[in-house]
Swiss-Prot record:
Residues 1-7 are cytoplasmic. Residues 134-163 are annotated as: Disordered. It is a single-pass type II membrane protein. The keyword Iron applies. This is Cytochrome c-type biogenesis protein CcmE. InterPro entries: CcmE, CcmE-like_sf, NA-bd_OB-fold. It comes from the Bacteria.
Amino acid sequence: MTRKQRRLVFIGTCGAVLAVALGLVLWAMSGTIVFFRSPSEIAREAVAPGVRFRLGGLVEAGSVVRGPDSQVTFAVTDNAARLPVRYRGLLPDLFREGQGVVAEGAMEPGGVFRADTVLAKHDETYMPREVADALKKSGRWQEGAGHPAPAPPRTASGEARAP
């Protein structure tokens, strides 16, 4: 075998090994990938019970009901559709009605989303990109909503000064 042929065999072997390694990594990760869906998408597409996904939207006002043993039920909405959620555990401190939330879990046979993880927005301007995109797509996004007004300028002593 000539030097050129050995080099081509070596490069081909390395390429094949890398392709197999990449395939194994992707196959191993396929079980951990969780897709994001909005309540409107769930209403349009029938999701089989037991399929894990992330549900994102806003906590519907007046829907939070706290039960015994840290059980909480609430509804997630994107202002076009709503989906009831059941969760057992401690909710994040920033969880409240009208705020953005992402819950991870699976649908139950009765059409209720059983969440095992609930994430709440962490400040006044944050909303998960997927939630914002879903709200924009449904035409319910209000530009500038949720952004706090800028604080008035302050003097060195901490007093508010006129702008």
